[in-house]
Amino acid sequence: MKQRALALAIKRIIWAELALSAAIAIPAFAQSQPAAADTAAGTTTESKPAAAAAAPASSTAATPATATGNGNVAQLKKFEVTGSLIRSADKVGFNQVQTVSQKDIQNSGASTVADFLRTTSANSANSWGEGQSANFAAGAAGIALRGLSEKYTLVLVDGQRVAPFAFFSNSVDSFFDLNTLPLNSIDRIEIVKAGAVSQYGSDAVAGVVNIITKHDFQGLQLDGSLGSALTGGNGDGTYKFGVLGGFGDLNSDRFNVTAAASYYKSNGFTLADRDSTRNQDFTQQPGGLSLLSPSYWNMPDGTAQPLMGCPPGSSVHPAGTNSIASAGVTGGAVCGTNTAESLSILPLTERLNAKLHADFKVNDATTAFGDFLISSNTSTSNQGVNVVGNPQTPTLVYNPQTKQLSPFNTVVPASNQYNPFGVDTPLTYTFPNAVAEETYATFWRASTGIKGSFNLPNGEWDWATSVSHSQSTVSNEYSNELNAGALNNIYQNGTYNFSNPAATPNGSVGLYTSANNLAISKLDTVDATLATPELFHLPAGDVGLGFGAQFTHQSEIMTPGGGFADGTVINPNLQTVNGQRNVAAVYYQLDIPIIRNLTFSQSGRYDHYSDVGGAFSPRFALRYQPVSALTMYTSYNRGFRAPTFVEDSNSRTLGIQVDQATGQNYTSITEGNPDLKAERTRNLDIGFQVSPTRTTDVGLEWYKIRVDNVIGQGAPSSTVVDPTTGQTLYVNIPYANLGYLDTNGFEGTLRQSLPTAVGMFTLSGDWAYVNSFKLGLPGGAPVNGAGNNYTITQPFGGSFPRWKGNTTLDWNYHKFDAALTWQFTGPYAQNLASQPSRVGSYSQFNLMMTYTGFKHWTIYGGIDNIFNRIPPYDPIFANGTLDQTGYDTSVYTYIGRFAQVGATYKF
């Protein structure tokens, strides 16, 4: 009730703002034309916006405007802003841009870029980190603005597009791995919380994240840190070291070279390292079951019978309380084995990243640049043990000739000496060795270009051109997979003692084998832009105009390797994708002052895709600043999203999904559809920012996003069943254009500084509330996924809390700084399990302290999750097959209380 009341209050604030805007605008339109700018008196002050950007071709290079010589009148300097072609001096533009500094990242306690961005309020739901179990994109992390999943958010590096991670998150979402960049190379991050298709193209529907790196650095800087979990279990020790250096002054030497490199290692941790998961027992939780891996005989009466002697490390437990067994039997008992060490919560990770940037001044108005980024990331995660005969996910064998899957025969014949019944009997059995996935991910990008400016009588024009190539290559190596032939020999010929494997030491010879798959993603880009904020002068201000053109070639290939493609192993990780496309685009932006303080902006982009055709995406925006302390803005966008290669190529993906009706898992093969149409999108944003004093900023925005022709899983084309038992083996599901997705919500920001005799106190907040996330699918009424876990049933989805927010209290006194951060995630309704009916909210407090009193040194340290909070329990994520954490891993990460200490030395 409190949340509904607050949401109602926020809506009323929005309506009040609109009324205020109208009240101020009407007399403004009625007044006479203002005097020309050159008759103004006095001196204006320089105002640098929070969203000053870097220098890509798609966001042209900025040379601050110089004085015009109009007496003593100094011109406001204009800077680049992510989301705009035209330089601006305005602190707040036509949409909300959140700027994150390196200090903000450090104060949050985050160890990596991904850790920080995934905690921002705009990343509300449906995004996945490196800890997701059974994910093709293991070790990688993305961001999903406004809950639209990762394929709707565009991530740029220095304003330029980059190749996505070679595998798809959740097997469907294309995304850029946030772990690619060295943390010490980042200058700031700009987050455009609005649709930006009219400038950036297809995948900027929910917004843009522009990661801007350090340029023109001089000197040498070393930094390092250590971290470790303190309570809640063991594991997750982290080590980080970085070096940043640069030489040359761009103004005096006419060149600068800046280089950064970093090494990061996390030891990761498993279920065995956390108090809440080490026993694999959720029977004390509402609707909870035991997650011990079972071994049992399937009796003719539908009950389970444990082996005549449980394997070493196992003990007898009721079948009805076992998550896996209870899905296939009606009673009895099983041998349960604790396999907590076999499933990782976070993988063991090593990352080595490096970046080199060079600028060369050709003349006072022209600069050439070159940039090279390379990243090598290795992650190792345990993917659990093989439970052959698992009733939740049938054991399948792939036939490379027919390209079909068939059931593995789990019936132990009467002739097998280890069958005690004398009749053919099905056996569900846990093989003890954990499947380990080792991921080798290499990313590199090379770009070069030239940018500059020239003067015409009416003003200065900025221009830029660039060309770049980026590539992601990812190899997944799997060990301890089960060889189908050797497994069949064990079941049929009695070479393996199920109760006492040590008694048959040669029984498992050839059973454990390896397999792999490979993916390569490439992107070639050519950009050119031309823009001026001073096309000509009107009584109300300057008219701005910008043009851009872009050509890209995209390609993606995924191939199952040995072990999977040849049918050697059971339950193969199959995902095949082979696609490429050319995209040509032209775009523009026109800013026109209507009256003083009221500006209209119109922009548009035409894209032509070689596989799905062309689309025009317009944007219309207004910005009104009646007084210097208040800025109001609104924008309306129409856009589109082209299908990803996994959606519109002849792809096939074997996976496990959650049944909407029962909450149970089932196996599926999702098939690409070359006949898919592009999704069509509409965005509406209305917001304001008020700064009544130099130390106060308050912002609020309401947004609405509509996506038509939503691409999702269509009706099953076929269902394959076991002819012997009638059990569903898997379901073939094609991608299709379905109904619509409609979401709306609020985002608010606050920053208040208070200078006192004992230092400067700053309170800042970043909060989001999702009012609605409706999915309108054929054949049924729309379903609102906000505030519940319905979207888990979609291929991209996770649970969707309505509320998410961060609040930080920072205290700075002389050389000392302390920041206390409260991270909040709201509750959500439990729709897919009978109990509990509600999953509770979650609060985490982090404390970071920094001291700069020693010459050249910055010493810092802190504690994350001070009170060692455990994420709220959700039985959907304690089901024995997909996840065993007991919480939604797309929303939370349970590291426990975590301490870190580090230092930076500047020469």
Question: Could you tell me what each predicted segment is?
Answer:
Residues T599, Y703-L832:
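Gram-negative outer-membrane beta-barrel transporters
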Residues P49-F136, A144, Y152, V157, ...:
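N-terminal plug
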Residues N771, F824-A829, Y851-F907:
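C-terminal beta-signal and adjacent terminal beta-strands/loops
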Residues I105, L117, I189, V209-I211, ...:
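Non-catalytic regulatory/gating segments with a bias toward low-complexity or hydrophobic composition
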Residues L226-L230, F247, Y263-N267, I374-T378, ...:
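Transmembrane beta-strands of outer-membrane beta-barrel pores
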Residues N170, D275-F282, P311-T349, K355, ...:
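Surface-exposed, low-complexity loop segments enriched in small/polar and acidic residues
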Residues V172-F176, N184-D187, S198-V209, H215-T277, ...:
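Outer-membrane beta-barrel translocator/receptor signature
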Residues D216-G219, L250-F255, V362-T366, S453-W463, ...:
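Short loop/turn motifs that connect adjacent beta-strands in outer-membrane beta-barrel proteins
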